Structures are given as structure tokens and as C-alpha cells.
């Protein structure tokens, strides 16, 4: 990692909005360095970390909701596997709205091979809302994802 210290820093951001929680609440997105055609020399990319934060609400009475925000990444074999989970949930005693929020940074440290100047570095990610208890159409979650990359020529 020390040899990456003086390399350029770049971020890639995404917002995943789940206006209600369904049986399958998943959104796919791509992290990309967007450097195709901007440099004349080959480069390497280090995908340093992924920061995920979320806010959400739920409605009900005497209601206990629990679940997880799952971050997944497509591996080299083409399969999307979980990187980590962030718990979500809360409890209400009366008819009202409840709120939940959370955040976590996942350290990745994934280094690419040398990339040609005419190609982008990219990785496919997913955000999946896992319903452990009570997350349904009366619940919403908005996730914010920030990937941090280093680019070395």
C-alpha cells in the first residue's frame, strides 16, 4: 500500500433508493474509474474501500422490524458474493413512523492489472435489503455508496 501513497485519489458514488421493501429488493451498479482515453500511458487501479450509509423509515404499531443491508461484489468467476452486512431495524409502541440509519466502511484493497489507456476499470456491485422480520411495503431505505480508488500510472 505504501507504493500507492502518492497516486491520484478518485471516488465513485451511487445512490440506491428502495421506496418500499419487496421480496426481492436488490439494485446493481458499477464502480468505474472513468479514465478511458484520458491518459496516454497504462495504469493500475487500487479499489481501496467502499463506504455504505443508509437512512430509512417504517410505519406501524407495536412493530418490530429487523434486517440487513448487504453489499455484494461480482468476483472474477462471475458470481456476486457478499462483502458484508449492516444491520437495520427498530421498534414502535404506537402508530407512528420509526426511523433507522447506519453506516460502515468495507476495506477492499483490490488491485487491477495494468489497464490500457483505452479501457476503464470497473467492478459490479449490488445492494440487497435482507428482510429478517417485518421489512415490507411500509418500509423504505435509501443507501449511499462511495468507492475510493487510487490510480497509478
Swiss-Prot record:
It holds the Pfam family Nanovirus_C8. InterPro entries: Nanovirus_C8. It is found in: Host nucleus; Host cytoplasm. Keywords: Host cytoplasm, Host nucleus. The keyword Lyase does not apply. GO terms for cellular component: host cell cytoplasm; host cell nucleus. Belongs to the nanoviridae nuclear shuttle protein family. Putative nuclear shuttle protein. This is Putative nuclear shuttle protein.
Amino acid at each position: 500500500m505504501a507504493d500507492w501513497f502518492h497516486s491520484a485519489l478518485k471516488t465513485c458514488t451511487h445512490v440506491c433508493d428502495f421506496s418500499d421493501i419487496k421480496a426481492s429488493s436488490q439494485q446493481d451498479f458499477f464502480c468505474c474509474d472513468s479514465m478511458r482515453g484520458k491518459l496516454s500511458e497504462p495504469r493500475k487501479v487500487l479499489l481501496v474501500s467502499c463506504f455504505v450509509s443508509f437512512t430509512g423509515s417504517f410505519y406501524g404499531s407495536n412493530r418490530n422490524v429487523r434486517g440487513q443491508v448487504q453489499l455484494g461484489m461480482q468476483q472474477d468467476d462471475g458470481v456476486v458474493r457478499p462483502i458484508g452486512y449492516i444491520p437495520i431495524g427498530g421498534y414502535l409502541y404506537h402508530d407512528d413512523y420509526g426511523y433507522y440509519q447506519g453506516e460502515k466502511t468495507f476495506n477492499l484493497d483490490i488491485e487491477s492489472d495494468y489497464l490500457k489507456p483505452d479501457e476503464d476499470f470497473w467492478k459490479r456491485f449490488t445492494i440487497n435489503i435482507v428482510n429478517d422480520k417485518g421489512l415490507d411495503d411500509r418500509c423504505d431505505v435509501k443507501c449511499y455508496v462511495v468507492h475510493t480508488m487510487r490510480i497509478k500510472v
